[in-house]
Amino acid sequence: MAAPSDFKPIIVGFLCNWCCYGGADLCGVSRFQYPPYLRVIRLMCSGRVDLEFIFRAFAKKADGVFIGGCHLGDCHYNPEGNYDALGNSFVAKRILAEIGVNPERLRLEWVSAGEGIRFAEVMNEFGAKIKSLGPFGSSEGKEVADLQAGLEAANELVPYFKLVERERFRVPKRTEDGYKEFFGKEDFDPLFKGLILDKLAMGRIMGALRTGLSSAEEVAQKLGFKPLEVANHLHLLSQQGMVKIDGSKVQIAVAA
C-alpha cells in the first residue's frame, strides 16, 4: 500500500546526551535541513534505551524509532553502553519481525557531537525511508490493533528477555563486527527461537485467550500460527498451570 502524499511520520528519537544530541544541536545551529518528523528524548547513554522503550513507542503508533549514540569506543561510560544498544537493536529487530512489524522502522546510528551534517544526512535518509513505508501497520499489511497486541506481549516479557541477553547472549568479541558475527551466525537462530521466540509465542497466545478466543483453531487463525504449533504451546502452558483445557469441548480458558 502506497503512503498518502500528505503523510507526516512520527519518529521517536532516543539520543545520547554526550554525542548524538550534541550533533543534533550542531545541526540546528548550522541550519542543516532535515524533515521535522523527529520527537527527541534525550538520555545520558544510548545503552539506556531499554527494549521496553522501543516496544512502547511502536505500541503508541510511532512510525519509526531512532537510536543515536556515540561512536563505538567513544562512550562516556564503562562498560561501553553503546555496545548494549547495539545488542538490544539486534534482539529488538528480530522480535519486531516476529510480531509482524517491519524491522526497518528501527534504526541505530553513531553520531558524534561534531557531526551535525551527518545527523542531517541520517535523518533525511531515515525520514524518507519511514515516509515510503507509510503509517505504522500499512507496509506490514496488518491491523494496528493486532500489532499492538503483539508488542504488549513482548513488553510483558522484557525482564525475561534482559535476563536471556545477560546470561546467554554474551558476545565474545566486543566490536561491531563481533556483534554482527554473533547475532548472524547460523547456530544462533535455533538458540534465539528456543529462548525468545517460543516464549513470545506463548505470551501472544495468552493475550489472544484474554480477548475471548477459546479454541486452538481460533488462536492459530488469529495469530497466523500453525495449529500444531499452538497445540504444543498450549500443552506447555497447561503443564505450567497457565491455562486450563476442557478436553470434552476442546476449549481453552486462561487459568484463574
Language-model segment annotations:
Residues 1-222, 226-235, 256:
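Iron-sulfur-associated redox domains of electron-transfer enzymes in respiratory
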Residues 238-249:
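A short, conserved structural fragment
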Residues 249-255:
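Minor-groove-contacting beta-hairpin "wing" of winged helix-turn-helix DNA-binding domains
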